[in-house]
């Protein structure tokens, strides 16, 4: 069974890059789902078993969450997923504590700094 990954990133170029990095970093048993906004990400998570992941047949194992999105903030999603059994990684342009510490408090397991060249 493929490991499911959700990538929430509103910038199509950055999202494509993250997809490529995930594919190249892991085996070919990866199934990547892409979302460009919070609404779509929430819908994909519901399909995989809801915010707890307990009822899903195959929940996401890794979720990459952009902090700044057109329809909200990625920390909103992190707060909703505190019981979800996936590793949650924040992707952001900002390396300061004002952005990273709150994300970690909301349930992020780590962060990945993005370049601003996208």
List the model feature ranges, each with a label.
Residues 66, 92:
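Active-site residues of response regulator receiver
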Residues 9:
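Conserved acidic carboxylate
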Residues 70, 96:
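The feature encodes the CheY-like receiver
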Residues 75-86:
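Short amphipathic alpha-helix used as the core "switch/output" element in two-component signaling
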Residues 12-36:
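Two-component/phosphorelay signaling modules centered on CheY-like receiver
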Residues 37, 73-76:
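Acidic catalytic/metal-coordinating carboxylates
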Residues 34-62:
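Acidic, metal-coordinating helix/loop segments flanking the phosphotransfer/catalytic sites
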């Amino acid at each position: 069974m493929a490991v499911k990954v959700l990538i929430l990133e509103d910038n199509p170029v950055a999202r494509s890059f993250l997809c490529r990095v995930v594919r190249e970093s892991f085996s070919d048993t990866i199934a990547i789902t892409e979302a460009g906004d919070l609404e779509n990400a929430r819908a994909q998570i519901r399909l995989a078993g809801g915010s707890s992941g307990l009822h899903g047949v195959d929940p996401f194992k890794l979720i990459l969450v952009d902090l700044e999105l057109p329809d909200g903030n990625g920390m909103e999603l992190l707060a909703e997923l505190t019981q979800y059994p996936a590793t949650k990684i924040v992707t952001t342009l900002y390396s300061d504590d004002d952005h990273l510490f709150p994300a970690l408090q909301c349930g992020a397991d780590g962060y990945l700094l993005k370049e601003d060249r996208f």
